[in-house]
């Protein structure tokens, strides 16, 4: 397995594997279910900024952050997208988007960030992930660092988190612009597919063993918004293993694999039992770029539109 492949799996699946004893993009993983929110004081640049992160913890800064360390690729994407890129002082070895993020000093990888390196940058805000990084939060806070956990369980939750990070970083207008684009994409998709019958859909996160997106994940939520009925939801929370026998029995109408698991749709025909799936016989097997559905950041809007185009291609293409 290549280093790139290991990194992708760590960032996408490792959080959830520990949480449900099987697997982690968002840099995924399922959170506590607490929606990120902000208090009225968050809007005031003159006083303390207080928001509630995806773990349910209140996060307060006396003033907007100027030195931000990101512990997950999705968090780095958020910072750059909302106009806080100049405030970034370090990120992980997996940060590859946008291009300028590659030049950031590294504090380690997603699964094993180096606490000493993080502290050496004297951050006034650390953007962490949930699950595997839960214990890390305690260590960082014991050293006096302020930590915001990015771990949304829904598409709307991802939008709320982006807005919260914007408040903490003092770039609310940039965050609002990103949030508006994500909301517009959601409304466009819902207008096209919202009244259509749900198409049974399976989304493959990993092929060996077969893994999918279950309940309590923003991917599951996005499949529903895009007009799909996620058969992976029956397997439980997070990113569980999924039985091939159950897959064949449920026979999804649409089969979507992330690009890190399958390179081209035709690959599925080489798997025992898969050639007889309705999705395969009807030509409804697709490969989707993993970073636009696995990272809970601004590009989820692109991922949502792509999912709708795969689940309901004719309706999604209509003007």
Segments and roles (model prediction):
Residues 72, 92, 130, 205, ...:
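Short secondary-structure boundary segments
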Residues 133-142, 254-271:
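A ligand-binding cleft/hinge motif common to bilobed small-molecule-binding domains
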Residues 67-121, 125-130, 231:
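A short, structured surface patch at a secondary-structure boundary
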Residues 94-97, 212-240:
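Alpha-helical, coiled-coil/dimerization segments enriched in small aliphatic residues
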Residues 112-131, 145, 243-257:
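Proline-aspartate-enriched helix->loop->beta-strand connector
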Residues 2-74, 173-202, 310-319:
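Bacterial Sec-exported substrate-binding components of ABC uptake systems
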Residues 30, 58, 124, 135-208, ...:
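Extracytoplasmic substrate-binding proteins
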Residues 54-56, 107-116, 153, 235-244:
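Short helix-initiation/N-cap motifs at beta->coil->alpha
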């Amino acid at each position: 397995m290549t280093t790139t492949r290991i990194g992708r799996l760590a960032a996408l699946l490792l959080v959830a594997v520990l949480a449900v004893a099987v697997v982690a993009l968002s840099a995924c993983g399922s959170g506590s279910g607490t929606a990120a929110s902000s208090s009225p004081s968050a809007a005031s640049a003159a006083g303390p900024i207080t928001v509630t992160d995806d773990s349910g913890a209140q996060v307060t800064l006396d003033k907007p952050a100027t030195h931000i360390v990101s512990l997950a690729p999705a968090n780095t994407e958020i910072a750059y997208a909302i106009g806080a890129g100049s405030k970034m002082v370090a990120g992980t070895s997996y940060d590859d988007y946008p291009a300028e993020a590659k030049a950031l000093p590294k504090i380690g990888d997603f699964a094993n960030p180096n606490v000493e390196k993080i502290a050496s940058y004297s951050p006034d805000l650390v953007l962490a992930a949930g699950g595997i990084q839960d214990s890390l939060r305690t260590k960082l806070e014991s050293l006096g660092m302020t930590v915001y956990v990015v771990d949304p369980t829904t598409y709307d939750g991802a939008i709320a988190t982006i807005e919260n990070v914007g408040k903490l970083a003092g770039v609310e207008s940039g965050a609002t612009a990103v949030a508006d684009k994500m909301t517009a994409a959601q409304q466009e998709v819902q207008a096209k597919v919202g009244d259509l019958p749900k198409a049974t859909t399976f989304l493959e996160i990993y092929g060996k063993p077969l893994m999918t997106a279950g309940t309590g994940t923003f991917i599951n939520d996005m499949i529903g918004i895009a007009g799909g009925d996620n058969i992976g939801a029956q397997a439980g929370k997070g990113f569980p293993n999924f039985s091939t026998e159950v897959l064949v029995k449920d026979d999804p109408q649409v089969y979507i694999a992330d690009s890190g698991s399958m390179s081209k749709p035709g690959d599925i025909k080489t798997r025992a039992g898969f050639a007889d799936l309705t999705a395969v016989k009807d030509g409804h097997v697709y490969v989707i770029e993993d970073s636009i559905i696995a990272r809970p950041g601004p590009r989820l809007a692109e991922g949502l539109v792509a999912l709708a185009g795969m689940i309901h291609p004719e309706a999604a293409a209509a003007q």
